[in-house]
């Protein structure tokens, strides 16, 4: 009995330590957002201490930002770029995953090995070559070309995830569809793809967030101010921080720019976690 009580006591102490560590981690994660928001709401005369909460909340930076056209151009370009990236990557990766799942074992193994080698290569290594090709073919300042390029980088890993999910779908469904006269394409789009809705929704969210936050490729390939994404608008705002007034405006730009991503992730985080758990179990 004493041994049980001692174990319960140790368990309670352990839970308290977990709680304390969790609070510290949450504080560290939330602190940059607190600084970002409070700096964006400060008056020019209220920058003596940047750690404390502002004396008066000043919304002028947000009003000025939202009245201008630059941030809205950035939103439009980011939506086009992210949407196209999601569409291209989901379609190509799901079809590739289906082909790998239903293909011959030797061919699938060889392609998976090539995929793993591609995934292991850091994207920064191919940056110079990619940039040269895009210039040669006149594809700079082109959101569609940038979307294809971004999607191509994510297809190997995404198709691998789709393959694991499709492996859990009985082959008998394919055979029944073939007996009814359906071809490979019809079988995939009418039978298999609807079964992949949970992972498709989750992957679409993750791909969209990744494209929205993509900085390196848009920085090199989008030089036209009319083609800049939100991330590049934020970069431009911080590059002009010559004083406290400009810093407050830059923080306001950053807050508005990242807000859609945070809202989407908070609303759909349960689906994302459930899908990732399901993927690990199926894998």
Question: Where on the chain are the PLM-derived regions?
Answer:
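A structural signal for multi-pass alpha-helical bundles of membrane permease subunits
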Residues: 6-10, 14-283
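N-terminal Lys/Arg-rich, disordered targeting/topogenic segments
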Residues: 1-5
């Amino acid at each position: 009995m004493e041994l049980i009580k001692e174990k319960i006591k140790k368990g309670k102490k352990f839970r308290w330590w977990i709680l304390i560590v969790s609070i510290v981690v949450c504080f560290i994660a939330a602190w940059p957002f607190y600084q970002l928001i409070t700096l964006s709401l400060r008056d020019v005369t209220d920058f003596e201490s940047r750690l404390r909460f502002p004396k008066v909340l000043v919304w002028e930076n947000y009003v000025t930002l939202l009245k201008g056209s630059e941030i809205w151009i950035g939103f439009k370009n980011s939506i086009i770029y992210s949407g196209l990236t999601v569409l291209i990557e989901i379609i190509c990766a799901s079809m590739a995953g289906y082909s790998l799942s239903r293909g011959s074992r030797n061919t699938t193994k060889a392609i998976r090995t090539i995929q793993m080698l591609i995934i292991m290569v850091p994207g920064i290594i191919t940056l110079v070559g990619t940039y040269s090709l895009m210039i040669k073919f006149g594809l700079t300042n082109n959101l569609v070309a940038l979307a294809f390029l971004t999607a191509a980088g994510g297809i190997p890993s995404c198709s691998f995830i789709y393959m694991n999910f499709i492996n859990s779908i009985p082959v008998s469904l394919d055979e029944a569809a073939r007996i009814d006269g359906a071809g490979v394409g019809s079988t995939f789009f009418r039978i298999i793809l609807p079964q992949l809705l949970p992972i498709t929704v989750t992957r679409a969210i993750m791909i969209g967030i990744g494209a929205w936050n993509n900085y390196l490729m848009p920085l090199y390939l989008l030089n036209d101010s009319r083609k800049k994404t939100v991330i590049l608008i934020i970069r431009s705002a911080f590059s002009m921080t010559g004083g406290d007034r400009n810093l407050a405006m830059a923080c306001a730009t950053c807050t508005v720019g990242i807000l859609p991503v945070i809202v989407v992730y908070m609303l759909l985080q349960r689906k994302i976690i459930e899908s990732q758990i399901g993927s690990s179990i199926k894998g």
